[in-house]
Amino acid sequence: MDRSLGWQGNSVPEDRTEAGIKRFLEDTTDDGELSKFVKDFSGNASCHPPEAKTWASRPQVPEPRPQAPDLYDDDLEFRPPSRPQSSDNQQYFCAPAPLSPSARPRSPWGKLDPYDSSEDDKEYVGFATLPNQVHRKSVKKGFDFTLMVAGESGLGKSTLVNSLFLTDLYRDRKLLGAEERIMQTVEITKHAVDIEEKGVRLRLTIVDTPGFGDAVNNTECWKPVAEYIDQQFEQYFRDESGLNRKNIQDNRVHCCLYFISPFGHGLRPLDVEFMKALHQRVNIVPILAKADTLTPPEVDHKKRKIREEIEHFGIKIYQFPDCDSDEDEDFKLQDQALKESIPFAVIGSNTVVEARGRRVRGRLYPWGIVEVENPGHCDFVKLRTMLVRTHMQDLKDVTRETHYENYRAQCIQSMTRLVVKERNRNKLTRESGTDFPIPAVPPGTDPETEKLIREKDEELRRMQEMLHKIQKQMKENY
C-alpha cells in the first residue's frame, strides 16, 4: 500500500460492504487516512461506525457531539484536540464542567467563599465578607459595658440589676444598720462579672453609689459621683495619650440608671440637682422604681409629670436615635414604644413563683402575683430590650463621641491655655532683660573675687544689650 498517495489508487478499499470496511479499518493504523476515509464516505448509507452491532437498526439521527466545557470558551487555542480512536470500543471523554456559583459550597454566613472563586464569577471580589470579618474579630475580643445605678436606698437597685442580667452581683454585700447609716457618706463601689451567652462574652461592670440621698443634709451629695466619672475619663485620656495604646481598658461609665422614688409627686430637688450635674457627663435613663406600689392610672400620671419636669428644668436625658428609613415597621413600632415608656416603671424580683401553672419571676401578694417579665405589669422587658438588645452599642457610641469628646476638648483647651500663658510669661521675661539672672555677691568674699564677679556682671549686661539691639534691628528689617 502506497501511503504517500493518501487515499488515491489502491488505498481505497474495493469491498465497501460492512465486513470489508471493518477489515480495512483493522489493517489501517494511520489516523490521517482514517479521518479522510470517514469524511469521504460519511454520506454512504452502508458506512456505519463500528461501535455496536445493532447500529443499523437505529434511526439515522446524528448523535450530538459532547460539548467542550465552558472552561475553554475564553481561550480557544488551549482546547484539547479530539481525535477518533481506531478501535471498536470508540468512546469520547470530556472533563466535568466547573461548579456554578449556586452549586459551590457556601460560607457559614450564606456568602460565596472569596477564596474559592472560579472563572464563571470572576467579577466577585470578596469585600462583601468584611462584616463577617468584623463580627469574628469582635466576638473573639469580647465586649465591655459599664452601668451605674444611682438613687436612694430601698428602691430596688440591686434587685433590678440581678434581674436584668440573671446573675447575683451582690452576694458579698453587707447591709449597714441604722446607726451606721447616720454617719455614712456617699461611696463608689464596683462589681465586675463576665457573662457569656451563645459564644458572646460580655464583661459587665456595675458601679453602685451606696449612701446617696440617705443623709439628712444631702447638699452636693452628687459630687463624688461626678468626680468618679471624670476620673474614668481622665484615666482613659492618659492611656490614650500614652505610648502603649494596645490594651487600653475602657472603664468609662456608659449609662446611668437613676431611680426615682414612687412616693413623691414628681421629681424632688435632689433628683433635679443630680441629673443637671451629670447630664453632660453620662447617659441618664430615669427609672420609676417600685411600680408595683402604684395603680396603672397612677403610673401614667407620674410618668407624664416626670417628663414635663425634665423638660422644664432643661435636663438632657438619653435620647433614642431616630430609625433609618430602611428599617422594618416592627422595629419602628418597637422603638416608638420605648420612647413613650420613659421613665421606665419597673419591678425587680429574684424569686420564682407559680402563676397559672407555670413558674415565673415575680412577687406574690395576697391579692395576686406581679410578674416581672409581663409587659402588662411593668416596663421591665422594655428596659432590658433597650439596655441590652437594641441600644447598648449606641450608649457606648454616645459616650465616646459626645461625653468623652467634650471632656477631651476641655482638657486640650486647658492645656493650650497653660502653654500660651507660659509662652507669654517667657516672652515678657526676655524683653525685661532678666533672661540670665545675676546672682548676688555672696558675703565674706575677698576684694579680688568681688572685682572679678562685677566684671563678669558688666560683661553679661553688655551681651544682653547687644542681643536686644540685634533683635530690634531684625524686627525693623522684617
Swiss-Prot record:
One of its GO terms (cellular component) is synaptic vesicle. Residues 289-292 are annotated as: G4 motif. Residues 141-414 form the Septin-type G domain. Residues 208-211 are annotated as: G3 motif. Disulfide bonds: none annotated. Residues 151-158 are annotated as: G1 motif. InterPro entries: G_SEPTIN_dom, P-loop_NTPase, Septin. The modification Phosphoserine is found at residues 117-118, 325, 432. Residues 13-26 have a biased composition (Basic and acidic residues). The modification Phosphothreonine is found at residue 434. Residues 447-478 form a coiled coil. Keywords: Cell cycle, Cell division, Cell projection, Cilium, Coiled coil, Cytoplasm, Cytoplasmic vesicle, Differentiation, Flagellum, GTP-binding, Mitochondrion, Nucleotide-binding, Nucleus, Phosphoprotein, Spermatogenesis, Synapse, Ubl conjugation. CDD domains: CDC_Septin (cd01850). The keyword Coiled coil applies. Phosphorylated by DYRK1A. Its main location: cytoplasm. It comes from the Eukaryota. Colocalizes with alpha-synuclein in Lewy bodies in the substantia nigra pars compacta of Parkinson disease patients. Shows reduced expression in dopaminergic nerve terminals of the striatum in sporadic Parkinson disease. Belongs to the TRAFAC class TrmE-Era-EngA-EngB-Septin-like GTPase superfamily. Septin GTPase family. Septins polymerize into heterooligomeric protein complexes that form filaments, and can associate with cellular membranes, actin filaments and microtubules. GTPase activity is required for filament formation. Interacts with SEPTIN8. Component of a septin core octameric complex consisting of SEPTIN12, SEPTIN7, SEPTIN6 and SEPTIN2 or SEPTIN4 in the order 12-7-6-2-2-6-7-12 or 12-7-6-4-4-6-7-12. Interacts with SEPTIN14 (via C-terminus). Interacts with DYRK1A. Filament-forming cytoskeletal GTPase. Pro-apoptotic protein involved in LGR5-positive intestinal stem cell and Paneth cell expansion in the intestines, via its interaction with XIAP. May also play a role in the regulation of cell fate in the intestine. Positive regulator of apoptosis involved in hematopoietic stem cell homeostasis; via its interaction with XIAP. Negative regulator of repair and hair follicle regeneration in response to injury, due to inhibition of hair follicle stem cell proliferation, potentially via its interaction with XIAP. This is Septin-4. It comes from Homo sapiens (Human). The gene is SEPTIN4.
